[in-house]
UniProtKB/Swiss-Prot annotation:
It comes from Arabidopsis thaliana (Mouse-ear cress). The lineage of its organism: Eukaryota, Viridiplantae, Streptophyta, Embryophyta, Tracheophyta. This is Protein SUPPRESSOR OF MAX2 1. Contains 1 EAR motif required for the interaction with TPR2. Probable component of a transcriptional corepressor complex that acts downstream of MAX2 to negatively regulate karrikins/strigolactone responses. Probable target of MAX2 during germination and seedling photomorphogenesis. Acts probably specifically in the karrikin pathway. Interacts probably with TPL/TPR in an EAR-motif dependent manner. Interacts with TPL, TPR1, TPR2 and TPR4. GO terms for biological process: response to karrikin; response to strigolactone; seed germination; seedling development.
């Protein structure tokens, strides 16, 4: 097996041979029977600056902590401890195992395929480099298993090394102090390249120390071989001048520093002294050796050591005219036979010692296969020196590729911020650089006559890397905080001083909001309003002032409106710019807060905002302020501009609806769910009310937290309505607050579920102190009306005189009129004026306008009307929206006007229509509490009967100016279609 080892060693480069020798020594130290790939891998990891260690760190960035690498070393140490020990004498080197031999052959094959210039050479002449040796070792199953135990992937490390080999280009050898090689146990080698940046005396001392350690190690190995009974004739094989070790050994033998070995007092005979033509004068050795042995003392262990010199004389014949192969066969074979005879003749008193290069020793084995047996040779591989800086430039280049600082991306490449923050970042770096420039100038003033190793070391960069990273992190964080829209859009819009036009994409009702909708810039199209630059709000400016260094530019954000116009004119421009709804709906949008407009302008999510505002305003038109607030908040959150959870944006949205309008809040949630996800909302009741209930039968018997968790798990893209959060117990409120902070909700069993992209809407009944409780009473009475069975009919009645509608009467006129009792049993007076003690003109009359508009209602919930126990929850939500008390007079007016317009469109102006007061109250209750929209109900129920009436009017023509069409209750039929609060058919009684 040693013959196989020596053969393999000749195919390795000096650094690879060093690793193999280290592995064999480690196996011998542990008294193992064989040298395995585990020994080689452990040797490669022995040095902190080792090539394999760097590859592991580079391929596993998350495991680059020193403790992780230490764990890898411990795993290999444990694996080596598990290997069986040898039963032979400890003096012999352990042979190479089959697995390691296979790895070495794989490395040789890979090296041959990777080097086209070596493909024409014999297989044994291919030099295996260290990188190919490491790759082959990593392919071994035992090594892969140990690396897996330490959470490292052997294929990943192998791929990293191969990538570094593909990307590396052989550079000019540049001395570098940081390139320290592999730090393996040093051995012999050629002269080391001098580093002009180091003290030459220090280099000389270091070189002498390394050389001394290497020679002592190799000398001890040769001495051990000379003391054996078998395989006692060493041949030092190596490409780094193995003759230096021979000279040290012969010197020790001559002075007697060999201990009690058999070679003590031996004489050294060199073939150089006999003849230059060693192969032809071997026969002369017989007489010379016999004479020397007679003169020596046989009792004192005297003998002769024959120095064969370089064995190239066995395979080369410079003066021969015949081919070298023929000379080797004819003359070399004679020398081998003659020396074998001498060795047998002087057995025990004659030793051989010689040197050979790797190539020479391979040729000796090829041309003289029996030379190792005949001469009782033991090949000793001489370790090369530790690779110093510049000795192996390509290897040093690969090592530098694994250095973290070498592969660090410059700061300006990883800085991800807007142009304004980037300009501030570069300005701050310039200021820091200007401060440190005097030190640089002082360095330039140093005398040039000094050698380089005496000059002060100049930094690679003027600014320390840590300082650059600190400034970079500072401006990254500041930009994320001050300009979140820049980091959350695929199309980044850079603010510029010139005005830009903004338009929106065509509206699509099926477009879901799971993917962000980006505004589109089309400079060729003009709108009535433009986007201008406006200074930041005071709050944002104050934050920027604290974080920004002196001299940083003023931060600007995009807002809607003209800078030169007043705030009132700005409100009109915003409403006009968002002109996607009817004039009736837009005229009440004056109370959109300035903060909402600034947020809207910053995020530039106009498309999404307009879509939400239009849809919710059409369905809940009496709560236009709340609709604007909800649309602004949801559009910002869906585009990543809302509140953040830590440093990351969150997908879930939390809204709080407060106020007395319970029906309006439900309709708002329904419209929001339809617009965002195209589904109906999921309602979960947290209080004691059961009017809406939890319609899902699977929720029965479950706690509120279990209902929420199950809903989130089943529908991660949905809108969940949590009604009456103000009536929930402390446990539920605490769990909801924890879910807001963590992004995960925990059920009653302790299981956590991610909130996903759910929009949570919590409702509460908190309202302003000025809101009258009469609204709640009237809403309850409307529920009673809606619960009764009723139907409508359209009939012709004689017009007795001009009559004003009751909702147009003034308060004084209504107070003078007697109370009218209706057959429906309505127990409250719709015309009774409210108390006027507080000076308010609000009334409980469903036909009277309230004065909330004059009180400056903004749609934002004030903490003054929120109990102290809920302040913490209100501060966590993305937005808290206040719903105003409903103006029932406006609802009645809208119903009447819509019916009149539709009647006039179909019938014409030849016939007028009026609505009975009692019928109007029933229609109001159905529209208010039902799910059917007013326009939809008119198209399905009113339009068909109007078409029939038109046909009869056209055919008969008997109706004059004294006749009017009247919509009234049908007293003959007390039934209504089941499941609907409004009748689906109207009876025509003509």
């Amino acid at each position: 097996m040693r013959a196989g080892l020596s053969t393999i060693q000749q195919t390795l480069t000096p650094e690879a041979a060093t690793v193999l020798n280290q592995s064999i020594a480690e196996a011998a130290r542990r008294n193992h029977g064989q040298t395995t790939p585990l020994h080689v891998a452990a040797t490669l990891l022995a040095s902190p600056a080792g090539f394999l260690r760097r590859a592991c760190i580079r391929s596993h960035p998350n495991s680059s902590h020193p403790l992780q690498c230490r764990a890898l070393e411990l795993c290999f140490s444990v694996a080596l401890e598990r290997l069986p020990t040898a039963t032979t004498t400890p003096g012999n080197d352990p042979p190479i195992s089959n697995a390691l031999m296979a790895a070495l052959k794989r490395a040789q094959a890979h090296q041959r395929r990777g080097c086209p210039e070596q493909q024409q050479q014999p297989l044994l002449a291919v030099k295996v480099e260290l990188e190919q040796l490491i790759i082959s070792i990593l392919d071994d199953p035992s090594v892969s298993r140990v690396m897996r135990e330490a959470s490292f992937s052997s294929p990943a490390v192998k791929a990293t090394i191969e990538q570094s080999l593909n990307n590396s280009v052989t550079p000019t050898p540049i001395p570098s102090v940081s390139s320290v090689g592999l730090n393996f146990r040093p051995g012999g080698g050629g002269p080391m390249t001098r580093n002009s940046y180091l003290n030459p005396r220090l280099q000389q001392n270091a070189s002498s120390v390394q050389s001394g350690v290497s020679k002592n190690d190799d000398v001890e190995r040769v001495m051990d071989i000379l003391g054996r009974a078998k395989k006692k004739n060493p041949v030092l094989v190596g490409d780094s001048e193995p003759g230096r070790v021979i000279r040290e050994i012969l010197k020790k033998i001559e002075v007697g520093e060999v201990g009690n070995l058999a070679v003590k007092n031996s004489k050294v005979v060199s073939l150089e002294e006999i003849s230059s033509d060693k192969a032809l004068r071997i026969k002369e050795l017989d007489g010379l050796l016999q004479t020397r042995l007679k003169n020596s003392d046989p009792i004192g262990g005297g003998g002769v050591i024959l120095d064969l010199g370089d064995l190239k004389w066995l395979v080369e014949q410079p003066s021969s005219t015949q081919p070298p192969a023929t000379v080797a066969v004819e003359i070399g074979r004679t020398a081998v036979v003659e020396l074998r005879r001498l060795l047998e003749k002087f057995e025990g008193r004659l030793w051989f010692i010689g040197t050979a290069t790797c190539e020479t020793y391979l040729r000796c084995q090829v041309y003289h296969p029996s030379v190792e047996t005949d001469w009782d040779l033991q090949a000793v591989s001489v370790a090369a020196k530790a690779p110093a800086s510049g000795v192996f430039p390509r290897l040093a280049n690969n090592l530098e590729s694994f250095t973290p600082l070498k592969s660090f991306v410059p700061a300006n490449r990883t800085l991800k911020c807007c142009p304004q923050c980037l300009q501030s970042y570069e300005r701050e770096l310039a200021e820091i650089d200007s401060v440190s420039s005097p030190e640089v100038k002082s360095e330039v003033a140093q005398p040039k006559q000094l050698p380089q190793w005496l000059l002060k070391a100049k930094p690679v960069d003027r600014l320390p890397q840590a300082k650059i990273e600190e400034v970079q992190k500072k401006w990254n964080d500041a930009c994320v905080r001050l300009h979140p829209s820049f980091h959350n859009k695929n199309e980044r819009i850079v603010p510029i001083p010139v005005p830009i036009t903004l338009t929106t994409s065509p509206y699509s009702p099926n477009m879901l909001l799971r993917q962000p909708l980006q505004p589109k810039l089309q400079p060729n199209r003009e709108l009535r309003e433009r986007v201008h630059l406006k200074p930041m709000s005071p709050l944002v400016a104050e934050q920027a002032k604290k974080k920004s260094p002196p001299g940083s530019p003023v931060q600007t954000d995009l807002v809607l409106g003209r800078a030169e116009d007043s705030e009132k004119a700005g409100d009109v421009q915003v409403r006009d710019f968002l002109g996607c709804i009817s004039s009736e709906s837009v005229q009440n949008n004056n109370n959109i807060s300035v903060l909402q407009k600034e947020n809207l302008g910053n995020s530039l999510d106009i498309d999404l905002f307009k879509k939400l505002l239009k849809g919710m305003t059409e369905k809940v038109w009496w709560q236009n302020d709340a609709a604007a607030a909800v649309a602004a908040t949801v559009s910002q959150c869906k585009l990543g501009n809302g509140k953040r959870r830590g440093v990351l944006s969150k997908g879930d949205v939390w809204l709080l609806f407060s106020g007395p309008d319970r029906v309006g809040k439900r309709k708002m949630v329904s419209a929001l769910s339809s617009l965002v996800y195209g589904t109906n909302p999921i309602m979960i009741q947290l209080g004691s009310r059961q009017d809406a209930g939890d319609g899902n039968s699977s929720f029965r018997g479950k706690t509120a937290l279990d209902k929420i968790a199950e809903t989130v798990k089943r529908s991660p893209f949905s809108v969940i309505l949590l009604e009456d959060i103000d009536e929930a117990d402390m446990l539920v409120r605490g769990s909801i607050k924890q879910a807001m902070d963590r992004g995960r909700i925990r059920d009653s069993h302790g299981r956590e579920i991610s909130l996903g992209n759910v929009i949570f809407v919590m409702t509460a009944s908190w309202h302003f102190a000025g809101t009258k409780t009469s609204f709640l009473d009237n809403e309850a009475k409307l529920r009673d009306l809606a619960s009764e069975s009723w139907r409508l009919r359209l009939c012709m009645r004689e017009k007795f005189g001009k009559r004003r509608a009751s909702w147009l009467c003034s308060d004084e006129e209504r107070l003078t009129k007697p109370k009218k009792e209706h057959g429906s049993g309505l127990s409250f007076d719709l015309n009774q004026a409210a108390d006027t003690d507080d000076g308010s003109h609000n009334t409980s009359d469903l036909t009277t306008d309230n004065d909330q508009d004059e009180q400056g209602f903004s749609g934002k919930l004030s903490l003054q009307c929120v109990p102290f126990a809920f302040h913490d929850m209100v501060s966590r939500v993305d937005d808290a929206v206040a719903f105003r008390a409903v103006d029932f007079a406006a609802v009645r007016r809208r119903i009447t006007e819509t019916l009149s317009e539709r009647f006039e469109t179909i019938i014409g102006e030849s016939l007028s229509v009026e609505v009975e007061e009692e019928a109007l109250q029933r229609i109001l209750s159905g529209v208010w509490l039902g799910q059917t929209e007013l326009e939809e109900w008119i198209e399905k129920a009113i339009v068909p009967v109007l078409s029939q009436l038109k046909a009869r009017v056209s055919s008969s023509g008997t109706y004059g100016d004294c006749t009017v069409a009247r919509l009234e209750l049908d007293e003959d039929s007390g039934e209504r279609n089941a499941g609907d609060l409004l009748p689906t058919t109207i009876t025509l009684a003509v």
